[in-house]
A protein has these predicted regions:
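Conserved SAM-binding motif I beta-strand of class I
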Residues: 45-50
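Conserved SAM-binding strand-loop segment of SAM-dependent methyltransferases
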Residues: 68-85
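A short SAM/SAH-binding and catalytic strip from SAM-dependent methyltransferases
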Residues: 97-109
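Substrate-binding/catalytic lobe of Class I Rossmann-like enzymes that use SAM or dcSAM, i.e.
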Residues: 133-234, 243-246
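A short glycine-rich, Lys/Arg-flanked "PGG" loop and its adjoining helix->strand segment in the class I
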Residues: 111-126
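Conserved SAM-binding loop of SAM-dependent methyltransferases across substrates and taxa
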Residues: 30-42
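A short acidic, Gly/Pro-enriched loop at the edge of an enzyme's catalytic core
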Residues: 86-98
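Conserved class I S-adenosyl-L-methionine
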Residues: 19-29
Length: 246
């Protein structure tokens, strides 16, 4: 998918990858960012962690497929939560870069999250985060119980773009922050939503019952409603690059 490739290329550029780093991806999803990095940078070494059993099982299957980029000996997978034991599990002061794509929305204690990252990074290391943000502060988006967001992303919130950029972290200095217009997300989601209904005869009722169809339809409606207002200026992505203080 070209849109995903463009997204990953931009993220790699903005985190200033040289291609020989030891990189840790927090909350790795199903490993598609890792696949891109391993295929693009032949000397990069990647570690990734997930707390999802389904994702871990899927990734392990991929790692056992010799034709898959994740079968590389430059990739390591960990299973667990992000907590006080994380640096013991993953390696203290080990990584040149620590990143996350679509994770920070579910982090309840941002300061503690960055303390964990501080323990994982080498001196002068850097950390990059890509997340959904709003341009302005929207109170109901800060409480997962107030919108459908919490139903699909447990504990999930949408922070205003300036929140992380202006946060005074003890061990980090902001290098640069970018607001990415949300209209491209809306266009992609709109196509997925159309494909969902255009192919309904293939999935209903054999693979999905009416309850699951309703669940996923509401998901698409929710996401499209987030990114469409003001032609993508109301909500989009925030991208943040920090350097660890010396």
């Amino acid at each position: 998918d070209q849109a995903q490739l463009d997204k990953f290329t931009l993220i790699a550029e903005r985190m200033k990858l040289q291609g020989d780093e030891k990189l840790l991806n927090l909350g790795c999803g199903f490993g598609y960012f890792e696949s891109f990095l391993l295929s693009t940078y032949p000397d990069i070494q990647i570690s990734s962690i997930t707390h999802s059993k389904d994702q871990h099982e899927f990734l392990t299957t991929r790692m056992n497929d010799s034709s898959d980029p994740l079968s590389s000996d430059r990739f390591q997978l960990y299973f667990g939560e992000l907590d006080s034991n994380t640096s013991t599990l993953l390696g203290k002061s080990k990584y040149d870069v620590v990143c996350s794509v679509g994770l920070v929305e579910q982090i309840k204690n941002i300061a503690l999250f960055f303390e964990i990252i501080n323990d994982l990074l080498i001196e002068n290391g850097r950390t990059f985060h890509h997340l959904i943000v709003s341009r302005d502060r929207i109170p109901q988006f800060l409480d997962p119980e107030e919108t459908l967001i919490g139903e699909y992303f447990p504990g999930g919130i949408i922070l205003p773009f300036s929140e992380i950029k202006n946060y005074k972290f003890e061990h980090f200095e902001i290098d640069e922050a970018w607001f990415v217009n949300g209209i491209n997300y809306w266009q992609t989601l709109n196509k997925w939503h159309a494909n969902f209904w255009n192919n309904m005869h293939l999935i209903y009722p054999e693979q999905m019952d009416s309850k699951r169809v309703d669940h996923w339809n509401k998901y698409f409606v929710l996401c499209k409603a987030i990114f469409r207002p003001e032609d993508g200026q109301a909500c989009g992505n925030g991208q943040y690059l920090f350097y660890k203080k010396s």
